[in-house]
């Protein structure tokens, strides 16, 4: 699917079918999104092969995502799907599906976000990066290419 956005008089043609699950895995193939212009500029120079985009996400969706990730609703959602054990930890069977426990949390948060806020993507709070699969979530994009 191709989507056209304008930002600062720049028309950007995105092929969302090429967006990967995370920037590191899809270097040279996907697109990498961030709120930080300086972060995008720095990494586009370092990697030289990735299209970086500064994204203005619908603020209501993003705020809800960051709040819900730490809220009782997320815990209740985990319990409803049987992801946690009696002590409140993720079950070993759930963790076994992923290479690292951080991956499990990230994927489960993404599933929760999609169900509860209709935001289809990953919000990496540590680095303030966003990987977006649902173009309807995007309000404005500024493209930075190496």
Which residues does each predicted region cover?
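Short active-site oxyanion
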Residues: 27-31
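Extracellular glycan-interaction surfaces
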Residues: 34-36, 41-42
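Active-site and NAD+-binding cores of ADP-ribose-processing enzymes
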Residues: 1-26, 44-146
């Amino acid at each position: 699917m191709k989507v056209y956005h304008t930002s600062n008089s720049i028309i950007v043609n995105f092929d969302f079918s090429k967006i990967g699950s995370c920037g590191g895995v899809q270097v040279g193939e996907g697109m990498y999104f961030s709120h930080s212009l300086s972060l995008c500029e720095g990494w586009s120079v370092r990697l030289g092969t990735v299209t970086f985009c500064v994204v203005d996400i619908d603020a209501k969706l993003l705020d809800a995502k960051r709040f819900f990730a730490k809220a009782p609703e997320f815990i209740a959602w985990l319990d409803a799907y049987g992801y946690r054990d009696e002590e409140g930890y993720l079950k070993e069977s759930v963790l076994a599906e992923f290479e690292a426990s951080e991956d499990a949390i990230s994927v489960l948060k993404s599933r929760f976000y999609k169900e509860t806020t209709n935001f289809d993507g990953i919000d990496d709070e540590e680095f303030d990066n966003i990987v977006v699969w649902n173009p309807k979530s995007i309000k404005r994009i500024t493209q930075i290419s190496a």
